[in-house]
């Protein structure tokens, strides 16, 4: 099965049973290997808004993992300033070809609520979360309110 066919099937399957933390799932008109959606975290401080997310599937998918990037700024130790997600499940060394997109999205939803302080990409945010959790939450809430997208009903 080609990457395009597998990704199209996964998109169709996921669209039929969209998890409560996702909205507006779609692919690029010209390229099914690029998905767009809104992530609606269920934990504070991120549940105050929604966040745009893009998934790029390589032509070698499922042999190579997809790339996840937030298109909405988010204050999080495992997400770079340009939105790239550091998620162990999609790292080259951990990726398994039988992993499905819905599993990746489930892992991302958990990561947003429970940051992985073992593998941060923004060390200063991981340090702040460790040393002063209340200050981290306050800054994350301010950032979320400033940059987040209104949650659809």
Curated annotation (Swiss-Prot):
Pathway per the UniProt entry: Protein modification; protein ubiquitination
Broad enzyme group: transferase
UniProt cross-references to Pfam families, sorted A to Z: UQ_con
Keywords: ATP-binding, Nucleotide-binding, Transferase, Ubl conjugation, Ubl conjugation pathway
GO BP terms in the entry: innate immune response; ISG15-protein conjugation; modification-dependent protein catabolic process; protein polyubiquitination; ubiquitin-dependent protein catabolic process
A GO CC annotation given for this chain: nucleus
An MF annotation (GO) of this entry: ATP binding
Statement: the UniProt record of this protein carries the keyword Transcription regulation: no
Record-listed E.C. numbers: 2.3.2.23
Annotated Gene3D superfamilies: Ubiquitin Conjugating Enzyme (3.10.110.10)
Domain UBC core: 2-149
Post-translational modification remark: ISGylated.
Entry keyword Transport: no
InterPro entries to which the protein is assigned, alphabetical: Ub_conjugating_enzyme, UBQ-conjugat_E2_core, UBQ-conjugating_AS, UBQ-conjugating_enzyme/RWD
SUPFAM superfamilies documented for this protein: UBC-like (SSF54495)
Active site: 86
SMART domains linked to this entry: UBCc
Reactions listed under catalytic activity: S-ubiquitinyl-[E1 ubiquitin-activating enzyme]-L-cysteine + [E2 ubiquitin-conjugating enzyme]-L-cysteine = [E1 ubiquitin-activating enzyme]-L-cysteine + S-ubiquitinyl-[E2 ubiquitin-conjugating enzyme]-L-cysteine
Function: Catalyzes the covalent attachment of ubiquitin to other proteins. Functions in the E6/E6-AP-induced ubiquitination of p53/TP53. Promotes ubiquitination and subsequent proteasomal degradation of FLT3.
Subunit-level organization: Interacts with RNF19A, RNF19B and RNF144B. Interacts with FLT3 (tyrosine phosphorylated).
Similarity section: Belongs to the ubiquitin-conjugating enzyme family.
Record's protein name: Ubiquitin/ISG15-conjugating enzyme E2 L6
Species this chain originates from: Rattus norvegicus (Rat)
């Amino acid at each position: 099965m080609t990457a395009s066919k597998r990704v199209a099937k996964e998109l169709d399957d996921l669209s039929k049973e969209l998890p409560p933390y996702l909205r507006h799932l779609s692919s690029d008109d010209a390229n099914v290997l690029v998905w767009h959606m809104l992530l609606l975290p269920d934990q504070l401080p991120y549940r105050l808004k929604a966040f745009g997310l893009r998934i790029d599937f390589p032509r070698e998918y499922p042999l190579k993992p997809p790339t996840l990037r937030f298109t909405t700024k988010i204050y999080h130790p495992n997400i770079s300033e340009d939105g790239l997600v550091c998620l162990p499940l999609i790292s080259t060394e951990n990726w398994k070809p039988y992993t499905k997109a819905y599993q990746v999205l489930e892992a991302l939803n958990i990561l947003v609520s429970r940051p992985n302080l073992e593998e941060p990409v923004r060390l200063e945010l991981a340090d702040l979360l460790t040393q002063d959790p209340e200050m981290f939450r306050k800054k994350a809430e301010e950032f979320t309110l400033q940059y987040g997208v209104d949650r659809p009903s």
